[in-house]
């Protein structure tokens, strides 16, 4: 009362009295329930639905109106009979109808504060003798109010009641706004605020991966604040709102049809979230039925598990997911309610209208085209189901009673009756010191567990627990089935849920991506995306990112990670091996055969004249070149890689060092002949061997240094264009391997140059020509090999095969051009493998320990020397 001046109070009183008297202008007689008592509790219930057009009130609300009203009367009766709760104190009631409208409810609630106004101002009406004036029609003094139902109603009423410090407990208002104690400091409720329900609904959407949904809310605090809380929870879970619609208070059919048309404009949003009052939900479902629209509805407790909402539109509501506050049915109330009829229930002025509406009959013989109600009609299990919030109505009445009981025990310790201290209640003390601190087990609840405790938190809110229902058709009968619950976390029995199309519906802005695709989110929209395929070598780090597995790895079948690819290398059973190995084996056999022939005929003139020491070195190099095929085909390992690097260059160095020594010897001899010089130095067999070994040693030293600087090993190599294949290779580049042959190339070039210079030697030295043929052919082979080697770098099998065959062909060139003719003479023309005398002029000859140049006559024998030995005549030396 400190907030109102005395003039404001009187004005409010006048307005309230005049306004309440004017209610009859709407052709709707104001009805109420008044039962006197020591303490009186007010009650606000949506006994009638809101009217249409100019009508304030509509049809009787059978479940949320009549049942809840009777639940309060039932609870009052039980408390008045209780010997332990408020013994000696009789509770009365003053129950009013809100007609499901906040403005109408506010008008009605003015009746609750009239008594407070009267009590406050009674001192102004004192008689001259000191007595108080006698007042007629004194309103009942309200200790507290139970209600309202809709949040918009409770907010309007709470704003009024707080001015007069009248505590209020709602049994159904769930708007989050009502938790604001700075504005609603005399309000409490036995139900939780909507943000718990909004969280539960968002978790249901996330559970089914419904990320693109539409919303519809009723105008007013329940719908608007509820959907706002839902949108906040949805954003936290990356759920997008396709379209957000709101139904106004007009209750016109066209507005609901318009909402359905807007919902149909978003075909990908197959799920529609409803935060609507029950009458709005019913009209929206009816509009969907008229439009033959099919959606999956996820509805708040405004829909709950009410049959009246889906009546006549069951096929449209099939598969809906709805939430209802978790509650236990009050079985004692069932017996009480089923015992009522118009003939024994005279305290409820709306009950006769309820009876006529429920049974579609008339209790009076009126000409309204209705049959007269049979006196044997009764409420039973076939036509009655307890409304879901009956328990909360009963708990609200008992909570107020427990608070009054504790206050009475404190203020009136010596009596069970009311004392003077409670004649005029201190609403502030009642609310803060007693009501917010109550803690008792819910009456009529068979389960004595934590869920049955009734108490309020610091904001005056109840505990947040919800049941999840699914609207199903079982055996041709539609009904709600409990399929889960929410209490901080969601629990669902998915197998029990029925869907309109027999499968979980999808509600996403974009179609789900394939298992090998990632989502490319569109700017400014977390729910719409474009599916982009991952590369074959990428895995899905998450649904938005394809990650490269990296060289040598490949994604698993489910693309959740990567595994190491098996190493690929030439195996002995591969078809590619047949050619190189066959050629190498054939070459090695030929080399062994030549060596055998030479050893067997080691002291024959032909073998001696061929420079057998260099021949054996040359044959060793040729044999080693054939062995390289096996090193290149063997599985790479540090040892094999070292042998490849050492053997390839060394085999060529051995061959071409021996050939270079030979061609150099011939060139120096005949350069000396032309210049008239003395016999060249270092043409003896031992000198030639040392020169050859020296040339070979250079290559060995170079390779050894290379092996030290770059230790041999293996590496897993992957081609950019063939990421699915990992090749096991030696840890050297192909270019490095070829660079290591630079020295051999120099030897080849020098051999070729010397072979070219000695191409016109006398016929006794036609071996120089065969060396020339060898070098020319070798150059052609390697000039052809190099481009093939690099062109086939993408296929290691072809590259390795090319390398092996080229090396083997180089060996065959040496065998074919240099040794095949000699072997042919030795084996098939032994008569030519002899020393013969023939006239030759201008030859170096051996004389004692020195070499002299002389002009010989026809009868003089002048042996030709090279490598310190005589050579045969043109018939043999040319070989």
From Swiss-Prot:
Topological region Cytoplasmic: 600-613, 665-688, 757-769, 829-879
Keyword hit for Nucleotide-binding: no
Ranges annotated as spanning the membrane: 577-599, 614-634, 646-664, 689-709, 735-756, 770-792, 803-828
Protein keywords: Cell membrane, Disulfide bond, G-protein coupled receptor, Glycoprotein, Membrane, Receptor, Signal, Transducer, Transmembrane, Transmembrane helix
Pfam families referenced in this protein's UniProt entry, alphabetically: 7tm_3, ANF_receptor, NCD3G
Family per record: Belongs to the G-protein coupled receptor 3 family.
The protein's name in its UniProt record: Metabotropic glutamate receptor 3
Organism: Pongo abelii
Gene expressing this chain: GRM3
């Amino acid at each position: 009362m400190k907030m109102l001046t005395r003039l404001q109070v009187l004005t409010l009183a006048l307005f309230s009295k005049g306004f309440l008297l004017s209610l009859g202008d709407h052709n709707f007689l104001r009805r109420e329930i008044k039962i006197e008592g020591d303490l009186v509790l007010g009650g606000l219930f949506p006994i009638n639905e809101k009217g249409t057009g100019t009508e304030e009130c509509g049809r009787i609300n059978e479940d949320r109106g009549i049942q809840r009203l009777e639940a309060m009367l039932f609870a009052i009766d039980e408390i008045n009979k209780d010997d332990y709760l408020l013994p000696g104190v009789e509770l009365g009631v003053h129950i009013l109808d809100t007609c499901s409208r906040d403005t109408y409810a506010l008008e009605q609630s003015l009746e609750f504060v009239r008594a407070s106004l009267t009590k406050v101002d009674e001192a102004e009406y004192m008689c001259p003798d000191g007595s108080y004036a006698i007042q007629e029609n004194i309103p009942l003094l309200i200790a507290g109010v139970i209600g309202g139902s809709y949040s918009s109603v409770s907010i309007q009423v709470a704003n009024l009641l707080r001015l007069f410090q009248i505590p209020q407990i709602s049994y159904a208002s769930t708007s989050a706004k009502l938790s604001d104690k700075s504005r609603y400091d005399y309000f409490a409720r036995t139900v939780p605020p909507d943000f718990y329900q909004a969280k539960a609904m968002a978790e249901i959407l996330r559970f089914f991966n419904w990320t693109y949904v539409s919303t519809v809310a009723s105008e007013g605090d329940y719908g608007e604040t509820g959907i706002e809380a839902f949108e906040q929870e949805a954003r936290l879970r990356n759920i997008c709102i396709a379209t957000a619609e709101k139904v106004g208070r007009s209750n016109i059919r066209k507005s609901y049809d318009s909402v359905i048309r807007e919902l149909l404009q978003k075909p990908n949003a197959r799920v529609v979230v409803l935060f609507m009052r029950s009458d709005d939900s019913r009209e929206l479902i009816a509009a969907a039925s008229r439009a033959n629209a099919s959606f999956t509805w996820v509805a708040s407790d405004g829909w709950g598990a009410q049959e009246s909402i889906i009546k006549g539109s069951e096929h449209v509501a099939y598969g809906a997911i709805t939430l209802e506050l978790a509650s236990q049915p009050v079985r004692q109330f069932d017996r009480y309610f089923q015992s009522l009829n118009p003939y024994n229930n005279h305290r409820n002025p709306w009950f006769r209208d309820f009876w006529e509406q429920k049974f579609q009959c008339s209790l009076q013989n009126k000409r309204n085209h209705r049959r007269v109600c049979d006196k044997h009609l009764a409420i039973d299990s076939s036509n009655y189901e307890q409304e879901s919030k009956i328990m909360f109505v009963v708990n609200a009445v008992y909570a107020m009673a427990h608070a009054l009981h504790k206050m009475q025990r404190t203020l009136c310790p010596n009596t069970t009756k009311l004392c003077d201290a409670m004649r005029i209640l201190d609403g502030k003390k009642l609310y803060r010191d007693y009501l917010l601190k109550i803690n008792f087990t819910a009456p009529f609840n068979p389960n004595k567990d934590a869920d049955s405790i009734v108490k309020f938190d610091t904001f005056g809110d109840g505990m947040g627990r919800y049941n999840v229902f699914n609207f199903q058709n079982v055996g041709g009968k539609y009904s709600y089935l409990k399929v889960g619950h929410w209490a901080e976390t969601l629990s669902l029995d998915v197998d029990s849920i029925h869907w309109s199309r027999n499968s979980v519906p999808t509600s996403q802005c974009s179609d789900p991506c394939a298992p090998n695709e990632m989502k490319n989110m569109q700017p400014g929209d977390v729910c719409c995306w474009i599916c982009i395929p991952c590369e074959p070598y990428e895995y899905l780090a998450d649904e938005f990112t394809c990650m490269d597995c990296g060289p040598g790895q490949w994604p698993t079948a489910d693309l959740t990670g990567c595994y190491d690819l098996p190493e690929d290398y030439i195996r002995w059973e591969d078809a590619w091996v047949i050619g190189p190995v066959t050629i190498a084996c054939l070459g090695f056999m030929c080399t062994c055969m030549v060596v055998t022939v030479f050893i067997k005929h080691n002291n024959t003139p032909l073998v001696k004249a061929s420079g057998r020491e260099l021949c054996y070195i040359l044959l060793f190099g040729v044999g080693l070149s054939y062995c390289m095929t096996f090193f290149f085909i063997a599985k790479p390992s540090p040892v094999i890689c070292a042998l490849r690097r050492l053997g390839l260059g060394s085999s060529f160095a051995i061959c071409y060092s021996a050939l270079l020594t030979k061609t150099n010897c011939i060139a120096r001899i005949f350069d000396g002949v032309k210049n008239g010089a003395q016999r060249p130095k270092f043409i003896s067999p031992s000198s030639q061997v040392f020169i050859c070994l020296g040339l070979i040693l250079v290559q060995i030293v170079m390779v050894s240094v290379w092996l030290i600087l770059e230790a041999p090993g293996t590496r897993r190599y992957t081609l950019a264009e063939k990421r699915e294949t990992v090749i096991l290779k030696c840890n050297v580049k192909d270019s490095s391997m070829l660079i290591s042959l630079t020295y051999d190339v120099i030897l080849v070039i020098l051999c070729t140059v010397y072979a070219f210079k000695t191409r016109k030697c006398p016929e006794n030295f036609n071996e120089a020509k065969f060396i020339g043929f060898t070098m020319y052919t070798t150059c052609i082979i390697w000039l052809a090999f190099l481009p093939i080697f690099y062109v086939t770098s993408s296929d290691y099998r072809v590259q390795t095969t090319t390398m092996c065959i080229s090396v083997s062909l180089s060996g065959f060139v040496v065998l074919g051009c240099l040794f095949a003719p000699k072997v042919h003479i030795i084996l098939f023309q032994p008569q030519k493998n002899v020393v013969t005398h023939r006239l030759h002029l201008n030859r170096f000859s051996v004389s004692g320990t020195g070499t002299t140049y002389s002009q010989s006559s026809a009868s003089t024998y002048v042996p030709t020397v090279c490598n310190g030995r005589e050579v045969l005549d043109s018939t043999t030396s040319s070989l």
